Amino acid sequence: DGKTPNTLFSLYKNAGIIPAGEAKGGISSALRVGLMYDSRNFEAAPTKGIWAEAHVAFAPKFIGTSVGYTKFNITFRHYVPIYRDRLVFAFRLNYQGYIGAAPAFYILPFDTILGPGYDRDGFGGYRTVRGLMRDRVQGINTGYFNTELRWKFVDFHVWKQNVTLALSGFFDGSRVFKGIDMESKIKLLNMGLDNFNFDYTSDKLNDRFHLAAGGGLRIIINQNFIVAVEYGKAFDKQDNAKGALYINTGYLF
């Protein structure tokens, strides 16, 4: 209609960044092959050990995928006891991306995992990078880290149940290592985009880390049921100006 698009989706669609055939979504059907190593002493609340995994997801068209792709994902987690099982330093490192052609745009946010569990929708939020807005970080090749200091400061019994209270402080971050080059396509459009920030639309720009920090309290019952309350705050207001409160179960990793 000649008017400037009023949403990013409309802008990317009109510029051809999102192809017309992908604009209404599609199907993703994949086969995953990988390896996992797990030496944690307790699955729910580990105090020592390593939990590492690597996998490749194949999603060819002949098994029903609308736009074929191949994705890899590598995750390393380590639990380091500092003082017995009372004070533990834990960290998680992740790097993932696509081999060959880029996938459809609607596949980019998903963080695929190996083993039991479910795929996560984008980086940002309780299951990936606390303090950041959900889906804040997306790209062809991406990575994130979580670091956490866990302190079990008191134990007691209630109704014959073992109860532990624990505090934690965390520092998380994520970054795009390879983005999608959209700058040239957008600049070809004469849409009056004088205020559009093209710095965020080039794969040649080195993205910075999107960082956040915070802390939380956990109630651990019988070493296997955990109630968690955490608050995270992003360092940059563009990543999340308000901070985020999480009430959930278990540890992040």
Where are these regions (language model features)?
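Outer-membrane beta-barrel "beta-signal"
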Residues: 219, 241-253
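Subset of outer-membrane beta-barrel
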Residues: 1, 217-220, 226-228, 232-234, ...
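Hydrophobic, well-ordered secondary-structure elements that form the walls
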Residues: 93, 147, 172, 217, ...
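Outer-membrane beta-barrel transmembrane domain signature of Gram-negative proteins
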Residues: 5-43, 203
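C-terminal outer-membrane beta-barrel translocator/porin domains of Gram-negative envelope proteins
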Residues: 21, 31-34, 42-161, 177-179, ...
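Solvent-exposed loop/turn segments connecting transmembrane beta-strands
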Residues: 25-26, 60-67, 137-142, 207, ...
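Outer-membrane beta-barrel transmembrane domain signature
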Residues: 2-12, 21-22, 86, 166-213
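Aromatic- and glycine-enriched pocket-lining scaffold segments that form the walls
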Residues: 1, 27-28, 48
